[in-house]
Amino acid sequence: MADGRVRAASPVLIISYETFRLYAKILHSSVIGMVICDEGHRLKNSDNLTYQALNGLQCERRVLISGTPIQNDLLEYYSLVNFVNPGLLGTAGEFKKRFENPILRGRDGNATDEEQKKGEEATKEMITLVEKCIIRRTSALLTKYLPVKYEHIVCCRNTELQDSIYNRLIETEKQNRAMEREKETGATASALSFITHLKKLCNHPYLVYEELQKSDNRFHNCLDLFPDSFLAKKCDPSTSGKMKVLDYILAVTRKTCNDKFVLVSNYTQTIDQFVELCKLRGYGYVRLDGSMSIKQRAKIVEKFNDPESSEFCFLLSSKAGGCGLNLIGANRLIMFDPDWNPANDDQAMARVWRDGQKKNCFIYRLLATGSIEEKMFQRQTHKKALSSCVVDAGQDVARHFSSDQLKELFKLETETPSDTHMRLKCKRCINGIESSDPPETADCTSDLALWHHSQRDARKIADPILRSVFNCGAISFVFHQKSHNVEVPKKKKEEDDEEYKPCEDEEGED
């Protein structure tokens, strides 16, 4: 192949993206019959080196395989389509003017009737063009072969300590920005630092404490809000709303059944807190993060999936192992914090609901009520709705969020049980009670408006564990839905309800 004349002994080459880039010049010299790119969304940016290297192949037959062709915006979708069918959607500039701009304006929560009409027309036109080269298979296929998956979006109240630090961070950032405007200095790096502080604070105050102690930290003045005894305990679930909910869920599960957990976070510092919690409660655990070799990862995954293993929790770094791992030894997964990219969260949450799973699965997404986490989740919802319209040709996908609302990242909404539910303008809930059920056909892929909404009444929550901890004092709202319908015998459901009644000392405990 190196000289372009000798026929390869083996007609198929299996190669990673990284290795391909190393040998791109050699591979460019030969005519290739077909290229198949798994995890095709890695080519979402036409400017990156991997895309350009693959695009240089002498190959007319190109196939991309991806579960998430749209992760953030329509230009990513354009890049994928343009790779397999160059010119089908015009140039990037033409695509933006002809399709992206009218579609996005039409999807805005404040769009006029005329803008919605133009957006729908542009969407239909684009779908007509690309459907000639796209075969779409959704996760609905899995429902024929896998047990039921129950998804829960759990809004958790911050503690008073978290709220006070959160508001001080916002006030300080406003002052810092005003000073930077006067000095005409750039604020991009400081803005990212501010966002990171808010996100970590939502997980646990300990995650920002050490950073704030540094004398050059721009938020150093938040230190006086911490109690003198703050560092007395390495892990104190009572100082974090989400950690408190996690602690309750793990405790009730451990007490009532033999289910195991995967705990996922984007931050290794948070995983450190998981470790301390497991030690505090005496839970067996294994941990996977970016410091592990491939052999080490395979070993601990095999160990955890062994039915005879004693490990109760698998502690997983989303960035290190959110893709490709099969963790069917657990059937419960807690996504402790959100990512900006919905595809990353979806990949991580798919670790337990996979081929070989025999138990019903329970997914819990924890969000700090009214915080930047709910705003991030709203952005995820907006992006997924866009994907539903464009990729899956979804009909009547609701427009819940305007572009202006999605920019309101930093305001802390302390008076609402869920900022997301408030922005849905839900017509099925009256005074915190769901007055009518979603349609029977609704599932985990449906619009949030078609999920169950539980604020004051936990009886409709299918998961007996979450029903049991609903009144722990830290949960303000729960969205919940299932992957598909199965009939549960009435007698069995009554037995579950009886088995998982909250203990008197748990209910209402703070």
List PLM regions with ranges.
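Conserved helix/coil segment N-terminal to the catalytic DExD/H
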Residues: 1-34, 48-52, 56
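SF2 helicase/translocase ATPase core recognition
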Residues: 44-47, 57-98, 142-171, 296, ...
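C-terminal accessory region of SF2 helicases/translocases
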Residues: 188-191, 368-510
